[in-house]
């Protein structure tokens, strides 16, 4: 309805802008969609230096609902990052979201501190523990499938729309043999 109203009524053929549709979708789903991490192929495993593990990282399910927490258990000092994030930021200071500030090197990330104010200018990267077993397949808007790993809490979101942080919104359709099946819904 909002899309039709935004175009106005006239006798000319209407051209629908996908950007307008995505913007309207975001307004509708953003207030309720919980946030999670997913790391898509290809990804790389990196070792974390100077970080005490095991560690439980607590993140908000939604930035406006501070009482709803999700946890990521980091049992060993290894995480996976998407290969393009790793390559684009190698040699730079980065923020691994919820985990801390690091200098990203060749095959490793060295913990420097947890100063969030300092990290404002850093690239903020999503990550998952290297021992993550939950897989995800997302049917993309162009019909292709994205394969990757997903945060464990996504198992509780079947039939809901979620935001995969730094990626897109998708609807978690089902869970089959330790693999979540999802459909892309909006940027």
Range-by-range predicted roles:
Residues 1-187:
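Catalytic adenosine-cofactor/nucleotide-binding cores of aminoacyl-tRNA synthetases and other
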């Amino acid at each position: 309805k909002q899309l039709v109203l935004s175009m106005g009524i006239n006798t000319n053929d209407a051209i629908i802008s996908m950007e307008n549709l995505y913007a309207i979708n975001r307004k509708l789903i953003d207030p309720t969609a919980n946030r999670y991490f997913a790391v898509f192929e290809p990804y790389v495993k990196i070792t974390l230096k100077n970080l005490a593990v095991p560690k439980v990282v607590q993140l908000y399910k939604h930035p406006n609902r501070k009482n709803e927490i999700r946890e990521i258990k980091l049992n060993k000092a290894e995480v996976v990052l998407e290969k393009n994030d790793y390559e684009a930021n190698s040699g730079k200071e980065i923020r691994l979201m919820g985990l801390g500030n690091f200098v990203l090197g060749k095959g490793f990330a060295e913990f420097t501190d947890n100063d969030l104010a300092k990290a404002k200018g850093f690239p903020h990267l999503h990550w998952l523990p290297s021992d993550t077993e939950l897989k995800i397949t997302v049917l993309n808007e162009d019909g292709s499938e994205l394969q990757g790993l997903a945060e464990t809490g996504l198992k509780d979101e079947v039939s809901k729309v979620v935001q995969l942080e730094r990626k897109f919104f998708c609807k978690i359709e089902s869970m089959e043999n330790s693999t979540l099946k999802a459909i892309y819904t909006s940027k």
